[in-house]
Curated annotation (Swiss-Prot):
It is a multi-pass membrane protein. It is found in: Cell membrane. This is Cobalamin biosynthesis protein CobD. The keyword Transmembrane helix applies.
Length: 314
């Protein structure tokens, strides 16, 4: 089956509809179903003891395995040819978030550009974990741009990459891994051991997509050479083995600095800067970042479309 064509169908539906509120109220969302399973298993299995890491490994394997097996069973029942591609694309649609990502960051950009800092702080609190009350205009712009860059990889390029590789099991399995990491893959007393496997697996499956995302941002920039140079120089200085690639490419493309120190509700993170000699982002840079995002995602879609065409004629 042409998995790349299936992903193109999913992209098209997502761009046209997003995930409608009426549908969410009626059936929820597949990621929330996965999250409920994780929460239930974590509640029963995450307790102190010398086997805490092993229990976390088993929970991660159970969640990923359950998701992949269900998705594989559904995929095996799809009809052959283009009807199967169309149905598969509809089923993959909930795992794609191009429109949602753009809308969430645009909701920050609108009040920030208008000078409404409280409104921008409220909007950015929906997409980042840091304390918004401490953020000035450059801080809000920086937080939103970092979220846009990192989540373009985690929420868009990575699931589509694995969808192209393995179809429904690939895209659904990736989302299970990413949801595990977002819920239990934290370096806290509660999750350091229990979430160890989830965090490591997430790092592994994002190795290629994160670098591809950085490349898409760099190639979509009018200043390709600078974006590529900043990415190559600074990406590895990020605390994450993967997030630095799209963030550094974004920083180079927009000629701003990203990452750096930030305040969370429970801690202060003193991170190195990406493109540290550049100025802080301004509100207008957030609009430029959204334009870069649109070009990069258009380029990604074109690449997937070309893969689909080559697949169909091979």
């Amino acid at each position: 089956m042409n998995f790349a064509a299936m992903m193109v169908v999913a992209i098209g539906i997502d761009l046209a509809l997003g995930w409608p509120d009426a549908l969410y109220k009626r059936i929820g969302h597949p990621v929330t179903w996965i999250a409920r399973l994780i929460a239930r298993l974590e509640k029963g299995w995450n307790f102190k003891g010398r086997l805490r890491r092993l229990r976390g490994v088993l929970v991660a394997l159970a969640v990923i395995g359950t998701t992949v097996v269900i998705a594989l069973a559904v995929q095996l029942w799809l009809p052959a040819g283009w009807p199967g591609v169309l149905i598969g694309g509809i089923l993959a649609w909930p795992f794609v978030a191009l429109r949602s990502m753009h809308d969430h960051v645009a909701a920050v950009a609108k009040p920030l550009i208008a000078g409404d800092l409280p409104g921008a702080r409220q909007a950015v609190s929906m997409i980042v974990g840091r304390d918004p009350s401490q953020l000035d205009q450059p801080g809000v712009a920086r937080a939103a741009l970092e979220s846009l860059a990192e989540n373009s990889s985690d929420g868009i390029v990575a699931p589509l990459f694995w969808g192209c590789v393995a179809g429904l099991p690939g895209i659904a399995g990736y989302k299970a891994i990413n949801t595990l990491d977002s819920m239990i893959g934290h370096r806290t007393d509660r999750y350091e051991e229990f979430g160890w496997a989830s965090a490591r697996i997430d790092d592994l499956v994002n190795l290629i997509p994160a670098r591809l995302t950085g490349l898409f941002f760099a190639l979509a920039s009018p200043c390709r050479a600078r974006a590529l140079a900043v990415m190559a120089r600074d990406a590895r200085s990020h605390r994450s083995p993967n997030a630095g690639w799209p963030e550094a490419a974004m920083a180079g493309a927009l000629a701003v600095r990203l990452s750096g120190p930030r305040i969370y509700a429970d801690r202060v993170a003193n991170e190195p800067w990406l493109n540290g000699t550049a100025p802080d982002p301004r509100p207008a840079d957030l609009a430029r970042g959204l334009a870069l995002y649109r070009r990069a995602m258009a380029g990604m879609t074109l690449v997937i479309g070309l893969v689909a065409v080559l697949w169909s004629v091979s």
